[in-house]
A protein has these predicted regions:
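Membrane-embedded hairpin module used as a gating/binding unit in multi-pass transport
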Residues: 175-251
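Entry/N-cap segments of selected transmembrane alpha helices
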Residues: 107-129, 280-307, 358-362
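N-terminal alpha-helical transmembrane segments of multi-pass membrane transport
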Residues: 1-74
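Transmembrane helical segments that form the transport core of multi-pass membrane transport proteins
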Residues: 223-307
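Alpha-helical membrane segments and immediately flanking helix-loop junctions
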Residues: 88, 96-103, 117-127, 131, ...
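Hydrophobic transmembrane alpha-helices of secondary-active transporters
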Residues: 34, 57, 85-109, 243-246, ...
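Intrinsically disordered, low-complexity non-transmembrane regions of multi-pass membrane transporters
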Residues: 1-19, 25, 75, 189-218, ...
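Alpha-helical transmembrane segments
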Residues: 167-185, 295-303, 326-329
């Protein structure tokens, strides 16, 4: 009888109920909210579902992220090994390859001035960097946090890992992906407030056709130029352009399909669940997390505003040929930010089609955010 009671007692002690803290319950509730937003509201489900599920798992069973050195048998938790690929910057780089294989840089090639709008939208990153330092973060932490302003989750994870700021990786990644999902909510008020009705109704000239040769040369030239100037961007820009070269060369269809689909989605699963698993209650429920979330919002809002303001400048310089609404697409949330530009413009003139014009700054923003990350790495001597 004692054996049975002891066995039952041990079984009960091993259940998660006996080890749950109030903080764990809060994070489980947050995971449920993310799942609701992803499944019911359709907010970036490919990202939020794995992130939310990783968050759920780690707060029910923390040892799923156990490091091997802390394990009795020397074997770590499952998601720890996924997370190691984040720390080594492997998964973010592979995500960029997949994005490159899915992306058409034609609108950017047809209108190179879009590069300027993509660059302007990176202002939010540098503004957030100095604000973060003012709030008490060290320079490397400030740099890792500020990249959230580009609305680019993989780059945020990449830079946090490279700068050794893994303690902030969970909040940074969750904030970055959350703001990517909330682009349709955050950007429109800024776009509407800082542009006139007349500017919103500006119709832009149709983009010129882009030849296949131009599309093939573009990833090669960008890789050579950017990586010669900032070699630290090679893992991101190099993989982005390699994926795009797969797509545009037309001779490696199997590689294109694999990079854009099978590999991309496998990496999203690994990246999402491992990022979610960094949000244990002990690591996430801190005042620092609130600061990071606030800084991310400031950075993203500043980036959107800078893009719109520079769009207004280009509108004046070109004699009203540029609709300032496409400036907000300079953040690297592809293609959500471009769709928002189209949606806001259509509210004022249903016959105004800005999507392809907005895609230029949007894809330029992907390159711009990677360059910003590479700049920080160069400043801190990280290779």
């Amino acid at each position: 009888m004692d054996y049975i009671l002891n066995t039952l007692s041990n079984l009960i002690a091993q259940t998660a109920f006996m080890n749950l803290t109030f903080g764990n319950l809060i994070m489980i509730f947050v995971a449920f909210i993310f799942l609701y937003l992803a499944i019911k509201k359709g907010f970036e489900p490919l990202l939020l579902v794995p992130i939310a599920f990783g968050m759920l798992l780690v707060n029910i069973y923390p040892d799923i992220m156990l490091r091997p050195e802390n394990s009795a048998n020397g074997v770590g938790g499952l998601l720890h090994y996924f997370y190691v690929l984040d720390e080594w910057s492997i998964l973010p780089s592979l995500i960029f390859m997949g994005v490159g294989a899915q992306t058409d840089f034609g609108p950017l090639i047809a209108n190179p001035k879009s590069f300027l709008l993509g660059a302007a939208a990176q202002f939010g990153i540098y503004a957030a960097y100095f604000i973060a330092i003012f709030m008490g973060f060290n320079d490397k932490a400030a740099a890792a946090i500020s990249i959230i302003g580009g609305a680019d989750g993989p780059t945020s994870i990449f830079l946090a890992g490279k700068l050794g700021q893994t303690e902030y990786l969970g909040p940074i990644a969750v904030a970055a992906y959350s703001y990517m999902a909330l682009v349709p909510i955050i950007q429109p008020p800024i776009m509407k407030f800082f542009t006139t009705d007349e500017e919103k109704r500006i119709k832009m000239e149709q983009l010129r056709p882009v030849s296949q040769l131009e599309k093939i040369l573009f990833p090669i030239i960008v890789t050579v130029v950017v990586c010669l100037i900032l070699p630290t961007t090679a893992p991101l820009v190099g993989m982005l352009m390699l994926g795009n070269l797969f797509k545009e060369s037309g001779v490696v269809k199997q590689l294109t399909e694999t990079a854009a689909n099978a590999m991309m989605y496998i990496v999203v699963i690994l990246l999402g669940t491992s990022v979610g698993a960094t949000t244990s209650a002990e690591a996430f429920l801190k005042v620092t997390t609130l600061k990071i979330v606030a800084l991310g919002l400031i950075a993203f809002a500043f980036g959107t505003l800078a893009g719109v303001i520079f769009g207004k400048v280009m509108c004046k310089v070109t004699g009203g040929k540029v609709n300032p609404l496409i400036g907000s697409a300079g953040v690297s949330a592809v293609p959500m930010a471009a769709r928002v530009s189209q949606k806001v413009g259509a509210e004022y003139d249903p016959t105004n089609f800005l999507l392809m014009h907005a895609m230029g700054p949007n894809v330029a923003g992907v390159i711009g955010t990677a360059v910003a990350a590479g700049t920080f790495m160069a400043i801190f001597g990280i290779v």
